[in-house]
Amino acid sequence: KKTLENIFDIETRLFPCLVEMRFLGVRVDEEKAKTFGDTLKKEQAETLKTVKKETGLDVDIWAADSIQPLLDHQKITDYKITPKTGRASITKLYLESHTNKYLKMIAKARQLDKLFNTFVTGILKFIHKGRIHADINQIRSDQGGTVTGRFSMRNPNLQQIPARSELGSKIRELFLPEKGHKWGSFDYSQQE
């Protein structure tokens, strides 16, 4: 009972700070986000255009059945079979680690598509007067949160922006610090 009261006390003291964070939101460069989105879509289209030009095949990057003809065309047989369907299992890891340049291009096109659809469109969808006011979940509930006590976010989920990639860095550049302030990065690993 005492532990539960301690948790309640901590959560209650933290709540006003979270409300203020949500109301303030995060500044976003909307024009830069639109331009970056256009760049991602253009690069994806150019990548798939190269695949078609060099192989003669149109590929739907998310459909294994559409990638199968490319595997056949390139005489690639080292893929795993999905037991349920008996078809090729085309995972992210398989595409990224394969030596075939066309499979690497499909992996790249998938990454560009995911960044655009998950992050750029998510950011643009939730901008209000130059800011994003994401939901910050403090504790586990039907609306989100984690069982470990960490925060989670949604609408959009800013925590899922790739941390260690060049494109992830470009997405982070869309967020602006308050005037007269700078961003900082602090990683308190294993501090739960």
Q: What positions do the PLM features span?
A:
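Conserved "right-hand" nucleotidyltransferase catalytic core of DNA-directed polymerases
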Residues: 1-170, 176-182, 189-192
